[in-house]
Design a protein with these regions (language model features):
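Short, surface-exposed secondary-structure boundary micro-motifs
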Residues: 207-210
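Short glycine-/small-residue-rich flexible loop motifs, especially phosphate/cofactor-binding loops
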Residues: 12, 34, 161-162, 181, ...
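His/Asp/Glu-enriched, well-ordered alpha-helical/loop segment
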Residues: 61-74, 91-102, 108-198, 204
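Active-site core of metal-dependent hydrolases
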Residues: 1-112
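Conserved acidic residues
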Residues: 43, 203, 214
Length: 225
């Protein structure tokens, strides 16, 4: 939500009363506006730094608020920020206040027309391929089954996580926190998700030492394509 928009406080109150977790999204909110809205259950920042009012030493803005408030989570779609920007947040927030997310939305699998106005590309299904129609008139086609081609369109969550040790100082344990326990705790689901112990749902992602995916289990059962 953009907390500076008219009616945002009413929406936040409703969500708080119904135990719905809310977060700041693309927003031009000032530091004081976010400080005020925290009383209504505003708990974090989605896609931290992306489309947010920037930091200034006299007006911390949305980005500054994300770093300042210890009790608010910073969600990162890691592929959308520089390594240094993430490193700065990591030093300030620590591993317990960061959640790794993704903005991968399956563009290569679109079944209709998806207009990506930020990238100025339309993704159009063309039989068994996807046509990328650029606003400048250029067209290119990709095969959704071609993994290397799809990687050029958007980075998967798994690949984004895999890149972490190569480009940041974040260790494997902290990566596991940011991708499992922290998100479960953030949405109040850590009583059954986010860790491995008796009584949990046994939702497991098995990876090798290179962080390549081996298999996935949902409630103790292996998921196969």
């Amino acid at each position: 939500i953009a907390p500076e928009r008219p009616g945002a406080d009413a929406v936040l109150r409703f969500c708080q009363e119904h135990q719905i977790q809310t977060a700041v999204g693309h927003s031009a909110a000032t530091f004081e506006e976010i400080k005020k809205m925290r009383a209504y259950g505003l708990g974090g920042f989605t896609h931290t730094f992306s489309g947010m009012k920037g930091f200034h030493h006299r007006e911390l803005g949305t980005a500054g608020a994300a770093l300042y408030f210890d009790d608010m989570i910073c969600e990162f779609a890691k592929q959308t920020v520089s390594h240094e920007a993430f490193e700065l947040a990591y030093r300030i927030k620590g591993s317990s206040r960061i959640v790794l997310t993704t903005d991968c939305c399956g563009l290569a699998q679109t079944q209709s027309c998806f207009d990506h106005y930020v990238r100025k590309i339309r993704f159009v299904k063309d039989r068994d391929q996807v046509c990328l129609e650029h606003y400048d008139g250029k067209k290119e086609w990709i095969d959704p089954r071609d993994y290397q081609a799809v990687k050029q369109v958007e980075m998967s969550y798994a690949q984004s996580v895999k890149n972490m040790p190569d480009h940041t100082k974040v260790g494997l344990y902290d990566i596991m926190l940011m991708t499992s326990f922290n998100p479960a705790h953030y949405i109040h689901a850590d009583d059954c998700k986010g860790s491995i112990r008796p009584g949990m749902d046994a939702d497991l992602t098995i990876m090798d030492q290179n962080l390549d995916l081996i298999c996935v289990y949902c409630r103790g059962k292996e998921i196969r394509e």
